[in-house]
């Protein structure tokens, strides 16, 4: 689960991380009132969407008068903000954050993320913070510093100072940087976050350290422990199809291709998508029905997939371990009838009750294309989608 920048800064503030004063706004008038309350003389008008790259996309602007705040708020609020993370369709801006302007002397980058390979938390930092951090990581990876934290021990002062020194933090700000790093780590652990990113972490002309941005992702499996974080959820920022899928315990992510995929198991789903790509196709979605899918669940999965009008063919790829192939077959038949399926459907089933499932499909009277291998299934569905 993601949250907005201003919500992330509320969390950071709770853990003692310095952030600028700011007020969220949901209308132009609220934006002007927020600027008046903050006092100025310089404000930052920030679009609030669940995506990075807002600055380059035109969603973060400086204002030096209340009239300019009004003008910029009118421009940004309601705009379809396109960034490298939103895709070409962009994301509508429904909220703004009006913030005190900052004295920017030097911008750093810092983040915390779980490294599954080492089973530790990685503290990642760079002296090159700001809008071009992705380019820095690509072109000069030596400027990205990584320190692995043992979750049993936690982030030590020595580790935090090592990172501060490695990114060239001046001596008069090192103690502050160490304090901020440790508080960020505490925030990361206590909130069950999967990502905390500050870009930029600013050092002003007086040597003070302050977080000018805040990006959070949270482990959805741990949200039951954090109702206060669930309260931050903004459904307007989420794909309606993904919200609908979650109601039926379906893992669904829409993509840009034209071949719908219905698979049981995340690993098989990714392998299926890779195979479709290998044979020249483009998957329209990731959809994992899980190990305990019912006929109703499969029907709902079809309905969700077909809400995407770009779907030209569907591939159902099932391995019947816990899942029985006859149950999937029943669901496929039911779904085809319920949605009046009008696009080609390729089905591959292997495992428990495989023969019964295939027999049910063959006797259904529906124009279902059968396949025995993943290569055959991918070949047939790619051809059918053309």
Swiss-Prot record:
Q: Which Gene3D superfamilies match?
A: ATP-grasp fold, A domain, ATP-grasp fold, B domain, Succinyl-CoA synthetase domains
Look at the named UniProt entry and state the broad enzyme category this protein falls under: ligase
SUPFAM superfamilies from the UniProt entry: Glutathione synthetase ATP-binding domain-like, Succinyl-CoA synthetase domains
Q: Where does Mg(2+) bind?
A: 199, 213
Keywords tagged on the record: ATP-binding, Ligase, Magnesium, Metal-binding, Nucleotide-binding, Tricarboxylic acid cycle
ATP-grasp domain location is 9-244
Tell me a GO cellular component. cytosol
* Name assigned to this protein: Succinate--CoA ligase [ADP-forming] subunit beta
Sites binding ATP sit at 46, 53-55, 99, 102, 107
Assembly description: Heterotetramer of two alpha and two beta subunits.
């Amino acid at each position: 689960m993601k949250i907005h920048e201003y919500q992330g800064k509320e969390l950071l503030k709770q853990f003692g991380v310095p952030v600028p004063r700011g007020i969220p706004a949901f209308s132009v008038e609220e934006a002007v009132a927020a600027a008046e309350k903050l006092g100025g003389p310089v404000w930052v008008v920030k679009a609030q969407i669940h995506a990075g790259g807002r600055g380059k996309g035109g969603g973060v602007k400086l204002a030096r008068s209340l009239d300019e705040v009004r003008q910029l708020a009118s421009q940004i609020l309601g705009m379809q903000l396109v960034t490298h993370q939103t895709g070409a369709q962009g994301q509508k801006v429904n909220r703004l954050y009006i913030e005190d302007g900052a004295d920017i002397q030097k911008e750093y980058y810092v983040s915390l993320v779980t490294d599954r390979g080492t089973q530790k938390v990685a503290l990642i930092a760079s002296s090159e913070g700001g809008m071009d951090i992705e380019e820095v990581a690509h072109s000069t990876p030596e400027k990205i510093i990584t320190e692995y934290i043992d979750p049993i021990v936690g982030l030590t002062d020595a580790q935090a100072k090592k990172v501060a020194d490695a990114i060239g933090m001046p001596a008069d700000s090192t103690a502050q940087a160490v304090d901020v790093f440790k508080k960020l780590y505490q925030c990361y652990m206590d909130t069950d976050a999967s990502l905390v990113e500050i870009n930029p972490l600013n050092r002003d002309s007086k040597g003070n350290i302050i977080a000018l941005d805040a990006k959070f992702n949270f482990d959805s499996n741990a949200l039951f422990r954090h109702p206060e974080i669930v309260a931050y959820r903004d459904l307007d920022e989420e794909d309606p199809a993904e919200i609908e899928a979650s109601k039926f315990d379906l893992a669904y992510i829409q993509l840009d291709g034209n071949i719908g995929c219905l698979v049981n198991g995340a690993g098989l789903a990714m392998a299926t998508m890779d195979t479709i790509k290998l044979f020249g196709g483009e998957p329209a979605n990731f959809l994992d029905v899980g190990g305990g899918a019912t006929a109703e669940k499969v029907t709902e999965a079809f309905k969700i997939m077909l809400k995407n009008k770009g779907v030209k063919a569907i591939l159902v790829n099932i391995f019947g371990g816990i899942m029985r192939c006859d149950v999937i077959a029943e669901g496929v038949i039911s779904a085809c009838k319920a949605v009046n399926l009008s696009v080609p459907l390729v089905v591959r089933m292997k495992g428990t009750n495989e023969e019964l499932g295939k027999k049910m499909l063959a006797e259904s009277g529906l124009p279902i294309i059968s396949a025995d291998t993943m290569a055959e299934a991918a070949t047939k569905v790619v051809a059918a989608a053309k």
